[in-house]
Amino acid sequence: LLGIEAVRPGGHIGDIGEAIQSYAESERCSVVRDFCGHGVGKLFHDAPNILHYGRRGEGAEMKPGMIFTIEPMINLGRPHVKILNDGWTAVTRDRTLSAQYEHTLGVTEDGYEVFTHSPGGLDTPGIAFEREPASAE
């Protein structure tokens, strides 16, 4: 979740992308470039686009009150995807595994606030595998 940790007033949108890309590539993964996060404002998919790759210091400056999503897709193989005939489903072209997460957050005066926390803790890495399955009562 290094992309989230890059959110701060005075930072730039490229800081988020650089954090995600540099970590993914250090783990021999790739970042899909066909999709991006987005601002949440008068429109749900509003400006600015939040790229999950990039260079620190580039892009719009983050300011308190900005609300946006960070939602990278990380592939074990190459970054290329294709959309299936249903017009919605994205798969990797090289048939490798891919993972995606999405959080909505806001820039605060001194950092950020994540708005998409799970009350049950399911947003914590690894938690889905550590919990016992819910009973089917």
Which ranges hold each PLM region?
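Active-site neighborhoods and metal-handling regions in enzymes and metal-associated proteins
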Residues: 1-137
